[in-house]
């Protein structure tokens, strides 16, 4: 039987790539930048770091990059923390103790410790790595995978590692295409025909469109693969640059384009289509990402058994829907409802309810994100809202129907999304939960 050259190439990849991938992942150290303040999320990050914000009914944002690492076979992971990190650290301790330390696996927390002679906290993304340079070197990686802790997506990092090695890159930058109107929030890049980056501008005021694709810009995902020698040298040089802001997107990547091989890696899903990736750094983006998960066939598939999203699961009973009378029927439509929730003659439509939330009789919740342990009273109407953890909504409350009235008590975004927190209602969640409080 004659085998075509294409089939021969496929067979060769089938038998050789798994070994190569295993070698690459073993030689890779992943570092997750999780120290961001998240000021655009307003009061949602008043007492938690942005990567610790709950999402999708049962997860924290940081669970997505960490799960991507584990599912990709990358089991040496450091998480760099700084801003209001207690709830994040507590979650990492509960959810991510699954590694086998005796075989070299770990999720290690690297808090800002003023480790250099300057005695400063992390001054930027590059400085965060520089202050942990000795720890990186101690693990002897060949490649360092740098990830943001505040993005929602599923991605096999081994494909990016392979691409990095096969293209001979010093740095590989994960990239996605976004509407040019949204590109000012990201690092915008230009590439040549081989996808080598020729220009990189961090958060430009007037982003350029891609050649041949008007209205579309190529932007950075905040995901980088570095070859270790290049990274160590770049970090040391940047640390000594007095005018640097010590940031990868603002300083190291742009300044290295002329002297290093920096490649763009287009993010694709398993079918070769543009992958689902969301920066949930603003309230409207956070709300929309949760709403995306309520669609019939969401672009981000939480039900993929081959790519699970790992997390800590509190021990609550199944969700309960009670009463079946006209005007008092417990039901949820196109929604995600976590364990411990009770819908007592209430209706929920196109919403995400986190664990241990109760909704009282004859209330309606639609197009909303309800964080854990919220109590919604009777005869309430809530729409287009984000209700923070532990909030008690009094009977008869109406939210999301009158922006002017909502703005008197709550935070209302330009898109009309209403953020409600316990503090806005004069409530003290710490006093009510006592020992039950878990961030």
UniProtKB/Swiss-Prot annotation:
GO terms for molecular function: ATP binding; glucose-1-phosphate adenylyltransferase activity. Homotetramer. Its EC number is 2.7.7.27. PROSITE patterns: ADP_GLC_PYROPHOSPH_1, ADP_GLC_PYROPHOSPH_2, ADP_GLC_PYROPHOSPH_3. The gene is glgC. Pfam families: Hexapep_GlmU (PF24894), NTP_transferase (PF00483). It is an enzyme of class 2 (transferase). This is Glucose-1-phosphate adenylyltransferase. Alpha-D-glucose 1-phosphate binds at residues 122, 187, 202-203, 220. Transmembrane segments: none annotated. Belongs to the bacterial/plant glucose-1-phosphate adenylyltransferase family. Disulfide bonds: none annotated. Involved in the biosynthesis of ADP-glucose, a building block required for the elongation reactions to produce glycogen. Catalyzes the reaction between ATP and alpha-D-glucose 1-phosphate (G1P) to produce pyrophosphate and ADP-Glc. The lineage of its organism: Bacteria, Pseudomonadati, Pseudomonadota, Betaproteobacteria, Nitrosomonadales. Keywords: ATP-binding, Carbohydrate metabolism, Glycogen biosynthesis, Glycogen metabolism, Nucleotide-binding, Nucleotidyltransferase, Transferase.
